[in-house]
């Protein structure tokens, strides 16, 4: 939450792209991040292919009105890294998720980080 607070305080947009059902995604986000203003929160939606299809990223780009070059896709799985590759955005794998580091490394993300605050170092270089 502190990372997301800091990103927003610095004027950056944050969004969620999940393969969980839309209603479940919204419920989890509302519960765990009640004070974060997400630009978009997308879960599994009828008629929209799930990740690693890049459609969810493209939908977020439209809503956020930004280009691919302005995105840091942060995820904890190989599917997330594949999604970033397919969407042609910068990828950042995190090691504190549900998948092992080796799975992330398989997809050669632009970054692999071990602590949330490392996102700030990447974004504000």
Question: Which residues does each PLM region occupy?
Answer:
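Substrate-recognition "cap/lid" segment bordering the active-site pocket of phosphatases
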Residues: 15, 21-73, 78-87, 101-103
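Short acidic-hydrophobic, aromatic-tinged amphipathic segments that line or gate anion-handling sites
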Residues: 111-115
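Catalytic-core regions built around general acid/base machinery
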Residues: 2-11
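Short secondary-structure boundary segments
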Residues: 19, 95-97, 116
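Short, glycine/polar-rich helix-capping loops at beta-to-alpha or helix-loop-helix junctions
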Residues: 96-106
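Structural signature of beta-strand start/N-cap positions in the alpha/beta core
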Residues: 10-13, 70, 90, 110
């Amino acid at each position: 939450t502190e990372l997301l607070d800091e990103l927003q305080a610095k004027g950056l947009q944050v969004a969620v792209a999940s393969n969980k059902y839309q209603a479940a995604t919204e419920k989890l986000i509302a519960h765990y991040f009640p004070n974060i203003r997400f630009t978009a929160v997308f879960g599994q939606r009828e008629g929209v292919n799930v990740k690693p299809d890049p459609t969810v990223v493209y939908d977020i780009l439209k809503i956020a009105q930004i280009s691919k070059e302005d995105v840091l896709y942060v995820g904890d799985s190989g599917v997330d890294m594949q999604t970033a590759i397919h969407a042609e955005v910068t990828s950042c794998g995190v090691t504190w998720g549900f998948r092992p580091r080796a799975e992330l490394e398989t997809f050669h993300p632009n970054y692999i980080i071990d602590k949330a605050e490392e996102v700030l170092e990447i974004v504000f270089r």
